[in-house]
Amino acid sequence: MNGEAICSALPTIPYHKLADLRYLSRGASGTVSSARHADWRVQVAVKHLHIHTPLLDSERKDVLREAEILHKARFSYILPILGICNEPEFLGIVTEYMPNGSLNELLHRKTEYPDVAWPLRFRILHEIALGVNYLHNMTPPLLHHDLKTQNILLDNEFHVKIADFGLSKWRMMSLSQSRSSKSAPEGGTIIYMPPENYEPGQKSRASIKHDIYSYAVITWEVLSRKQPFEDVTNPLQIMYSVSQGHRPVINEESLPYDIPHRARMISLIESGWAQNPDERPSFLKCLIELEPVLRTFEEITFLEAVIQLKKTKLQSVSSAIHLCDKKKMELSLNIPVNHGPQEESCGSSQLHENSGSPETSRSLPAPQDNDFLSRKAQDCYFMKLHHCPGNHSWDSTISGSQRAAFCDHKTTPCSSAIINPLSTAGNSERLQPGIAQQWIQSKREDIVNQMTEACLNQSLDALLSRDLIMKEDYELVSTKPTRTSKVRQLLDTTDIQGEEFAKVIVQKLKDNKQMGLQPYPEILVVSRSPSLNLLQNKSM
């Protein structure tokens, strides 16, 4: 089958039909965004590769061939593929949009979902097994080999839709084009990978037994609502431990005695993650074990569980919106915020003392013209400013330990004594563009013409790693169809976000030896401190 036949067999969705592209997440298979199809008038999801260098025809055909296979895998618990967007600078798979996110979010966002009823947990496990069993029974069998809670999506009624199966070429292209310097697999994938797959030479033997191992780990995770190996930070430690026969702990703490059908489920887990692949059961046998478990629950209990989740999610969203509206009202009216004792732990007095220094003032970017910002971006921007300034890069005169002492992101917003971006306390105090910003503004068209795709992507990576760019701004840049439009959007964002943002871009231009832009300004790019990153990770 040639590339042209593959293209014609797949429904083609033009890029310009994908309106309102919004960044959702990024994984091994590419970046996922939501969009609204201009003709269908429905929300869709788009998984697209970042094409930093032109794909060879053979590479594009391989990716399209995989998409064609996925399009044929139509089943109740498989994520439906609606078509492909195949354009020179944009290659993406368009699927149905899943409003309830992933199983990973359901299990581990305990504030949003404080309780997930047992009937629903068992239904989810049953539907995962049904979906993978269907893939294994295709001709030829379609093996997932990247089954994890992040790839198990949930529709409006919390039914399972398995995603990212059969995307080995897609993942390969994404990793080869990746901007990250990390070569080791992400810990999230290692957790679900069987030990025989740690050695590349043995991958062919693993075959159909790979997915049942992953499923066993997922089952443990669903029943415990804990992250497997959550205390281990180094993926190599996990690999060594698993290769020695260790698995996530099965005891009363991880799997309490009140779990329905506990003994049967533990037996299924232990056989599924057996060290010897030949001792692991097929998904058919797994389903035979699960079916009597499902029959013990009345149909009404599944409906009640779903309704309860929807209620708690709605309450969580309503609370967040109420808080957001309250903050915006206080900002727009320039009203000081009366914080409780817990919120005062941010140390507003320290911040007030520092706010007088020109260095600190320069490091807190404020929009020069709100017309540059979309309404949603404005809201998020002001919310971000109104929180403790850990999301911004501070001047080098402020140490990481001082920044960490200023606030705990896990709990509280700071006092409004920090800044009010709408304050009218004198135009002379408005933040002026720094050296890097002024240089970028003076070289704008030269940068647009000369900044390479690789340099652009490295800049975005660096901004993400320093938490200097918001998701909304990232998506506005990354989803533009051409290199020049991406660069223009990035420079527009630089005008708004401030000096530290601009410094990163200047540094990346220098690193990529874009000599046509010389002379460069002398700048110092401040790296974020590990202590601050730790605080932020805990808050997410």
UniProtKB/Swiss-Prot annotation:
Changing K503R: Abolished ubiquitination by ZNRF4. Keywords: Acetylation, Adaptive immunity, Apoptosis, ATP-binding, Cell membrane, Cytoplasm, Endoplasmic reticulum, Immunity, Innate immunity, Isopeptide bond, Kinase, Membrane, Nucleotide-binding, Phosphoprotein, Serine/threonine-protein kinase, Transferase, Ubl conjugation. Residues 18-294 form the Protein kinase domain. Changing E472R: Abolished activation of NF-kappa-B. Changing E475R: Abolished activation of NF-kappa-B. Residues 432-524 form the CARD domain. The modification Phosphoserine is found at S168, S174, S176, S178, S180, S181, S363, S393, S527, S529, S531, S539. This is Receptor-interacting serine/threonine-protein kinase 2. Residues 167-193 are annotated as: Activation segment (AS). GO terms for molecular function: ATP binding; CARD domain binding; caspase binding; identical protein binding; JUN kinase kinase kinase activity; LIM domain binding; non-membrane spanning protein tyrosine kinase activity; protein homodimerization activity. The modification Phosphotyrosine is found at Y381, Y474. The lineage of its organism: Eukaryota, Metazoa, Chordata, Craniata, Vertebrata. It is found in: Cytoplasm; Cell membrane; Endoplasmic reticulum. It comes from Homo sapiens. Gene3D superfamilies: Death Domain, Fas, Transferase(Phosphotransferase) domain 1. ATP binds at L24, S25, R26, G27, A28, S29, G30, T31, V32, K47. In the inactive state, the helix alphaC is packed against the helical, non-phosphorylated activation segment (AS). Upon activation, helix alphaC is displaced and the phosphorylated AS becomes disordered. Specifically inhibited by GSK583, which blocks NOD2 signaling by interfering with XIAP binding to RIPK2. Specifically inhibited by CSLP37 and CSLP43, which blocks NOD2 signaling by interfering with XIAP binding to RIPK2. Changing S176A: Decreased phosphorylation and activation. Abolished phosphorylation by LRRK2. GO terms for cellular component: cytoplasm; cytoskeleton; cytosol; endoplasmic reticulum; plasma membrane; protein-containing complex; vesicle. It comes from the Eukaryota. Contains an N-terminal kinase domain and a C-terminal caspase activation and recruitment domain (CARD) that mediates the recruitment of CARD-containing proteins. Serine/threonine/tyrosine-protein kinase that plays an essential role in modulation of innate and adaptive immune responses. Acts as a key effector of NOD1 and NOD2 signaling pathways: upon activation by bacterial peptidoglycans, NOD1 and NOD2 oligomerize and recruit RIPK2 via CARD-CARD domains, leading to the formation of RIPK2 filaments. There is a cross-link at K209, K410, K503, K538 (Glycyl lysine isopeptide (Lys-Gly) (interchain with G-Cter in ubiquitin)). Changing T452K: Impaired interaction with NOD2 and decreased homooligomerization and ability to transmit NOD2 signaling.
